[in-house]
């Protein structure tokens, strides 16, 4: 089947749209992708919506700016699909399904609550293409973490690679997550801790720029290793997989312990980057076997300082997704196209070893265009 996957991650920097050909079990090819960046107004709206979501107690609650944000991102996701189709000279009739993640505004698996805004029916009607959305809800309702969702996709991709195993596929978005894969074993997965979110927010506040471009600021700074070690004392980092995080889970905890207010921009960036690397490395002792190969995707893959810190702490080769024929920027969008096809076929999206679900579970809600 030919699917388009859509992803707007916790970094809130834009929408990734990617074409994929798959039967939901194997990947025939990873097609073209594009990114539609969010403007400053949309990003501010999403940040406000995320703040308003803190008081949400049910998945359908839409207080404050959530209603406007949901409409806005649905419209923008439709525009992203059309832009991708136009770039490939395709029409909606050429696409079997769209996988629509939406925007996570609240993730509290401890309260059996995860909220992704986005109007699946409106998107299906706009595009005239079937849409699968709400991909996390069934897992959380069954007692799972609802994240990460992508391990089954990583498993399909890694089957075609000749790398020393176990292989870790690391996505560094706003939150970082890892999938650990070995032939004959169920995938193991979890969120590892802060990815880019805290660093991006720090850079935006200090410089007005949305991120530390290629880790240039961090490369000039000095890491406060004692402060990083103090943050790693949080119980989350000692908990075994599966486990997951909300984007803002550590904001107050980290800010207080890293003493960022008194740090220079470069030193703050260096320490936050080191925290991301150290929290990823901290998952290794919690695994049955240490990964022998690491493949890095997501926005963090574009940060050479973070990659260097990660390689130093892991002590094994770290390669970016492009080095194995994938796209670091589009990997999660490709994943949601893959997951949409699995959902259509009733195949499992989540597993006890990836989200803590009680059994392998399918998920997602299908929205057909209104006749």
Swiss-Prot record:
Record's catalysed reaction(s): 1,6-anhydro-N-acetyl-beta-muramate + ATP + H2O = N-acetyl-D-muramate 6-phosphate + ADP + H(+)
The keyword Signal is assigned to this record: no
Record-listed E.C. numbers: 2.7.1.170
Database matches in NCBIfam families: PRK09585.1-5
GO function terms (MF aspect): ATP binding; kinase activity; phosphotransferase activity, alcohol group as acceptor
UniProt-recorded name of the protein: Anhydro-N-acetylmuramic acid kinase
Pfam family, one: AnmK
Family according to the record: Belongs to the anhydro-N-acetylmuramic acid kinase family.
């Amino acid at each position: 089947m030919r699917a388009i996957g859509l992803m707007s991650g916790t970094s809130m920097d834009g929408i990734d749209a990617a074409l994929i050909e798959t039967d939901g079990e194997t990947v025939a090819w990873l097609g073209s992708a594009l990114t539609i960046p969010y403007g400053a107004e949309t990003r501010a709206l999403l940040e406000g919506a995320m703040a308003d979501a803190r008081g949400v107690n049910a998945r359908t609650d839409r207080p404050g700016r959530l209603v406007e944000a949901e409409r806005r991102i649905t419209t923008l996701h439709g525009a992203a699909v059309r832009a991708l189709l136009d770039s490939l000279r395709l029409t909606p009739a050429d696409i079997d399904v769209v996988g629509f993640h939406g925007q996570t505004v609240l993730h509290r698996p401890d309260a059996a609550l995860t909220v992704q805004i986005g109007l699946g029916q409106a998107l299906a009607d706009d595009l005239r293409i079937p849409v699968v959305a709400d991909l996390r809800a069934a897992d959380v309702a069954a007692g799972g973490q609802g994240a990460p969702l992508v391990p089954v996709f990583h498993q399909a991709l890694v089957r075609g690679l000749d790398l020393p195993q176990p292989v870790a596929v690391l996505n560094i978005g706003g939150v970082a997550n890892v999938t650990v894969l070995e032939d004959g074993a169920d995938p193991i997965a979890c969120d590892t801790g802060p990815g880019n979110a805290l660093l991006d927010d720090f850079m935006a506040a200090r410089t007005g720029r949305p991120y530390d471009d290629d880790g240039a600021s961090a490369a000039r700074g000095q890491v406060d290793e004692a402060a990083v070690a103090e943050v790693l004392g949080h119980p989350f980092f000692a908990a075994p997989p599966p486990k997951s995080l909300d984007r803002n889970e550590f904001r107050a905890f980290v800010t207080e312990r890293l003493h960022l207010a008194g740090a220079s921009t470069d030193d703050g960036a260096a320490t936050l980057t080191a925290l991301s690397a150290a929290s990823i490395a901290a998952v290794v002792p919690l695994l049955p076997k240490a990964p022998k190969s690491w493949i890095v995707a997501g926005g963090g893959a574009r940060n050479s300082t973070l990659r260097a810190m990660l390689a130093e702490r892991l002590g094994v080769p770290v390669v970016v997704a492009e080095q194995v024929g994938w796209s670091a920027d589009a990997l999660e969008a490709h994943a949601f196209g893959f997951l949409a096809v699995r959902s259509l076929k009733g195949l499992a999206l989540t597993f006890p070893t990836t989200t803590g679900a009680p059994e392998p579970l399918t998920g997602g809600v299908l929205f057909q265009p209104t006749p």
